[in-house]
């Protein structure tokens, strides 16, 4: 769905190695499939963030875990890059999962500042956006063959910390 965004259900079924009937039973429309994948991506990202223990782990350990968790599900990351909608972060949205994820990460970057890992002249919110901007850009570039997968975690860490490090 990322590399062939206009693919029909038949083409999508073939790409994942199932029959169209099987895919149709799972999700009868393309829109239903997108919504189901968005839900799965949201759950996966939330679980990855929770597993990093951003609230209590030492900040350097949690930061490395955040990068690793982000890279573990790069296919879903690519899907989210393509299908993420601004309303996911709207305060009036009844589904608060993305707002909770965003707040957890904002709070983590604030903690990194308070503990001297990150500079304080850039807001924690901006650091969160910069971090995920770097990470998503590199994942997307890797999918196009421009950046190798090997060493990606170290590259993200180095590029972020050298610009934002205290």
Which residue stretches match the model-derived regions?
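Generic hydrophobic, amphipathic alpha-helix propensity
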Residues: 12, 37-41, 45, 105
